[in-house]
Amino acid sequence: MTQAFTVVIPARYASTRLPGKPLQDIAGQPMIQRVWNQARKSAASRVVVATDDERILAACQGFGAEALLTRAEHNSGTDRLEEVASRLGLASDAIVVNVQGDEPLIPPALIDQVAANLAAHPEAAIATLAEPIHEVSALFNPNVVKVATDIDGLALTFSRAPLPWARDAFARDRDSLPEGVPYRRHIGIYAYRVGFLADFVAWGPCWLENAESLEQLRALWHGVRIHVADARETMLPGVDTPEDLERVRRVLGG
């Protein structure tokens, strides 16, 4: 029997490149409703939107979503997740999946996959997903987060830089991917054991996390194991810019 899990969708109004992003209309529905709809298609026993904005809260209540108004001063999405897990009274061994509020095209199967992976790997406190990198431009793009794992699928590290650096191959040619190096792009969906979240918040950011602007490095810094599996379905890009928004509108608007 698959372990039950809760989905939490953090949704902030403030966005440098796309203010009010969760409320942007996509084919007649606000983006946050699109994300919520996808999450509800998963096997989650509960789907909760976590927001720091009254406008988003009102919109969620309007279309029937369970939503919580959280504190505004959280340092990261995981810190916000810990507040929600605490307020919901989730048990320490419960699993919670963090689905980003700007992923209206997220496949429900990936939500189920990451939750099941964590349940199947008791040595890990976090599970996440990745997919192969096929283009050298993605490898050198700092907005594409790379991940390297050990033989058991546990993360060694994450970086915005090319990871690993193929010294000899790149000395000859940086216009193509080196042969024999399985480069992988991290997909930003996480499953957590609730008991881990309080530790994560109490630790505070580390210098490596700050340098890369990758909060999962805080967990690795403290020796926490992160299980990484290849995604079973393609994860289409989320919405970060007005151009992304128009692309998704075209996809969902038919």
Curated annotation (Swiss-Prot):
The gene is kdsB. The keyword Nucleotidyltransferase applies. It is found in: Cytoplasm. Activates KDO (a required 8-carbon sugar) for incorporation into bacterial lipopolysaccharide in Gram-negative bacteria. Belongs to the KdsB family. GO terms for cellular component: cytosol. GO terms for biological process: CMP-keto-3-deoxy-D-manno-octulosonic acid biosynthetic process; lipopolysaccharide biosynthetic process. Its EC number is 2.7.7.38. Its main location: cytoplasm. Pathway: Nucleotide-sugar biosynthesis; CMP-3-deoxy-D-manno-octulosonate biosynthesis; CMP-3-deoxy-D-manno-octulosonate from 3-deoxy-D-manno-octulosonate and CTP: step 1/1; Bacterial outer membrane biogenesis; lipopolysaccharide biosynthesis. The keyword Transferase applies. HAMAP family: KdsB (MF_00057). InterPro entries: Cytidylyl_trans (IPR003329), KdsB (IPR004528), Nucleotide-diphossugar_trans (IPR029044). It catalyses: 3-deoxy-alpha-D-manno-oct-2-ulosonate + CTP = CMP-3-deoxy-beta-D-manno-octulosonate + diphosphate. One of its GO terms (molecular function) is 3-deoxy-manno-octulosonate cytidylyltransferase activity. Pfam families: CTP_transf_3. This is 3-deoxy-manno-octulosonate cytidylyltransferase. Keywords: Cytoplasm, Lipopolysaccharide biosynthesis, Nucleotidyltransferase, Transferase.
